[in-house]
Amino acid sequence: MNINATLIGQSVAFFIFVLFCMKFVWPPVIAALQERQKKIADGLDAANRAARDLELAHEKAGQQLREAKAQAAEIVEQAKKRANQIVDEARDQARAEGERLKAQAQAEIEQELNSVKDALRAQVGTLAVTGAEKILGASIDANAHEQLVSKLAAEI
């Protein structure tokens, strides 16, 4: 193998080509590779953050669902208590109304009984005086008749 001027010329051209590539071609290629590497790393970080956010969102949704169920159960329990309270109040009101009506009816019965007793006393007194007049055969004056009826009614 002969080393001649062509080989030296080619070596110099190759060396200039390598310097040219190192100066003008290689830096943009390296920059593009580094930028691409940074974008990929950022994308992986974003994916990891999104996965963590998704997991947190699932946990938060589960917690809110549990809280909503607990709140719904509490509302149902309060509604049941209120319904029982309303039923008890209605029962107490009905009982009180029944007792009031019973007392009112008892008072009316007593009043009617007293009225009937008074009327019966007056009738008995009148009958007694009439019977006494017939037995005695004489009439008793009105004043004596009134006193006798009052006395007899008081005794009965």
Curated annotation (Swiss-Prot):
Subcellular location: Cell inner membrane
MF term (GO), any: proton-transporting ATPase activity, rotational mechanism
Membrane topology per record: Single-pass membrane protein
Primary location recorded for the protein, binned into one broad class: membrane
TM stretches of this protein: 12-32
Superkingdom field: Bacteria
One GO CC term, this protein: plasma membrane
Alphabetized Pfam families for the sequence: ATP-synt_B
Family statement: Belongs to the ATPase B chain family.
Self-association state and partner proteins as the record states: F-type ATPases have 2 components, F(1) - the catalytic core - and F(0) - the membrane proton channel. F(1) has five subunits: alpha(3), beta(3), gamma(1), delta(1), epsilon(1). F(0) has three main subunits: a(1), b(2) and c(10-14). The alpha and beta chains form an alternating ring which encloses part of the gamma chain. F(1) is attached to F(0) by a central stalk formed by the gamma and epsilon chains, while a peripheral stalk is formed by the delta and b chains.
Function (record text): F(1)F(0) ATP synthase produces ATP from ADP in the presence of a proton or sodium gradient. F-type ATPases consist of two structural domains, F(1) containing the extramembraneous catalytic core and F(0) containing the membrane proton channel, linked together by a central stalk and a peripheral stalk. During catalysis, ATP synthesis in the catalytic domain of F(1) is coupled via a rotary mechanism of the central stalk subunits to proton translocation. Component of the F(0) channel, it forms part of the peripheral stalk, linking F(1) to F(0).
Protein name: ATP synthase subunit b
Species whose genome carries this gene: Pseudomonas paraeruginosa (strain DSM 24068 / PA7)
GN (gene name): atpF
